From Swiss-Prot:
Enzymatic class: translocase
Biological function: Core subunit of the mitochondrial membrane respiratory chain NADH dehydrogenase (Complex I) that is believed to belong to the minimal assembly required for catalysis. Complex I functions in the transfer of electrons from NADH to the respiratory chain. The immediate electron acceptor for the enzyme is believed to be ubiquinone.
Name assigned to this protein: NADH-ubiquinone oxidoreductase 19.3 kDa subunit, mitochondrial
InterPro entries: NADH_UbQ_OxRdtase-like_20kDa, NADH_UQ_OxRdtase_20Kd_su
Species classification: Eukaryota, Fungi, Dikarya, Ascomycota, Pezizomycotina
Cofactor: how and how many bound: Binds 1 [4Fe-4S] cluster.
tRNA processing as UniProt keyword: no
Length: 226
């Protein structure tokens, strides 16, 4: 009698389905990777709601390009900036400041092979008629005051392109006692063109980068926000 009862109980235990065993490591990964949990009714509860943490709503800040025509003044100033920047980047008049062998590649830019005139780039001999200065070559200590004087005579807005390794940081003559280790110690530089000497294509690419910088200049908008 007792043996039959034990046999029936063991058969009942074997017939009962066992619960699914979830590894501890897998359960931890699932709780970390999931950003929301479901309650008993099936609704999605935000993470941290069970701990009583209030979730703050994210506030989207519109970019200047997404403002559209909400403000008439802002729209007018943005349009005016686009027109002025287009006119400036389409008529660059560089002030030639050739100091060494990099000036040969700068002169090569004006030849028919590249024809810089088709882009509105015309070399000027007077700093008062220029808006871009191309420092091409090695800048010595004796030439530094002249560079600064020519830069001060240029009207605003003005930009500077440092052409070549010598103008960027001294280059081959970096440890010489008579060489300025970079023309950015004398005048503020906007575009650096590497190379010894850089090719005319590299200088042309530097001019394109300067035009890109001009397109993103906020002239009247910065004045209006002051």
């Amino acid at each position: 009698m007792m043996s039959s009862v034990r046999t029936g109980a063991s058969m009942a235990l074997r017939a009962r389905p066992t619960a699914q065993i979830v590894p501890f490591r897998a359960a931890a990964v699932a709780s970390i990777s999931s950003s929301s949990r479901k309650d008993a009714t099936g609704a999605v509860a935000p993470a941290g709601a069970q701990h009583g943490i209030a979730r703050r709503e994210r506030r989207e800040v519109p970019l200047p390009s997404q403002e559209g025509t909400k403000g008439a003044v802002q729209y007018a100033l943005t349009t005016l900036d686009s027109i002025v920047n287009w006119a400036r980047q389409s008529s660059l008049w560089p002030m030639t400041f050739g100091l060494a062998c990099c000036a040969v590649e700068m002169m090569h830019l004006s030849t028919p092979r590249y024809d810089q005139d088709r882009l509105g780039i015309i070399f000027r001999a007077s700093p008062r008629q220029s808006d871009v200065m191309i420092v091409a070559g090695t800048l010595t200590n004796k030439m530094a005051p002249a560079l600064r004087q020519v830069y001060d005579q240029m009207p605003d807005p003005r930009w500077v392109i440092s052409m070549g390794s010598c103008a960027n940081g001294g280059g081959y003559y970096h440890y010489s006692y008579s060489v300025v280790r970079g023309c950015d110690r004398i005048v503020p530089v906007d575009i650096y063109v590497p190379g010894c000497p850089p090719t005319s294509e590299a200088l042309m690419y530097g001019i394109f980068q300067l035009q890109r910088k001009m397109r993103n200049t906020k002239i009247t908008r910065m004045w209006y926000r002051k």
